[in-house]
Every structure is written in structure tokens, then in C-alpha cells.
């Protein structure tokens, strides 16, 4: 009898703990908390992308061999790809903001960062596949890869017109992490 009660109590504890997790998972972070988390995720990403842009421009004009330029560009684009995935993952970890259409807002941010990650990955793969035997064709290939990257990057921008949230707009304007 005692064993049966202990087993029942143990099952009840597990059910209650699971229910508590489910209920706790229903409410997402406040708009301010979510905006702060997103800005903390995007700040290092922006810095990395800025560094990439500057470094790519330098590589395109530097007096290096095609093999050196290829190695440097592949490394730079791999870094941007990794930074984009890290930012995407951190936005995912921020959860869903407690606002109307919060799921769509979070998914939009994650989707945009995922598309950027993929664009950098494709640019890295394209440049890694270029032949470095002749400088002219190599740099033409690099320019084409960067042009494609820029188009894909522009196309991956988050369309905020459908995800407009006054609470999130205010939060992004107010939290110190976003300044």
C-alpha cells in the first residue's frame, strides 16, 4: 500500500512539474526583454558584418595573389556565415515576444538571419571553388559572387510592414541594448 502511494505521489509530482513547464512556456518574454535579447544577439553580428565589408573591400583592392585573396575571402565569409547563425540561434533562444503576432515576429527575425547565413555560405562556397591560376578570371568570379551575395542579402531583409508591433517598436527605441 505504501509503495503504491509513493508511486502515485511520484507520478503526480512528474505530472505537476510537466504542467508547470507547459504553463510557464505559454507566456513569452515581455517586449522590452525580447528587444534587449535580440539587440544583444545582433550587436556582435553587426560588428562582424561591418568588419567583413571593410575586409572584403580591402581584399578586392589589395596587392595579393589570387590564392591569398581566395583564402582570406573564404575565411571572411565563413566568419560571417557563423556570426549570422550565432545571431539567428540567439534570437531563437530569446523566445517569442509577448505581443500580438509574436510568433511571426520571432520567426521573421530568425528567417531573415537564416537567409543571410545561407547567402554568406553560398558566397564562401563559390569563392572556394574558383580557380586561382589566372588573376583576371578569378577576380571576375569574386565580383560575381559578391554581386550575388549583395542581391541575396538585400532579398533576405526582414519585411517589418506585416510585423508592426507598437510595443516592440517602443521597446527597441527604449532599451539600452538597442542604442
Where are these regions (language model features)?
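Bacterial N-terminal signal peptides that target proteins for export
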Residues: 2-16
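C-terminal motif of bacterial Sec signal peptides marking the signal peptidase cleavage site
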Residues: 22-25
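Immediate post-signal-peptide N-terminus of mature secreted/exported proteins
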Residues: 27-78, 174-178
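Short, charged, amphipathic alpha-helical segments
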Residues: 36, 67-78, 103-110, 114, ...
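Amphipathic alpha-helical coiled-coil/heptad-repeat segments
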Residues: 45, 52, 56, 80-83, ...
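Short, solvent-exposed, charged loop/turn and helix-capping segments
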Residues: 85-110, 122-134, 159
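A charged, solvent-exposed segment within the mature domains of Sec-exported extracytoplasmic proteins
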Residues: 123-179
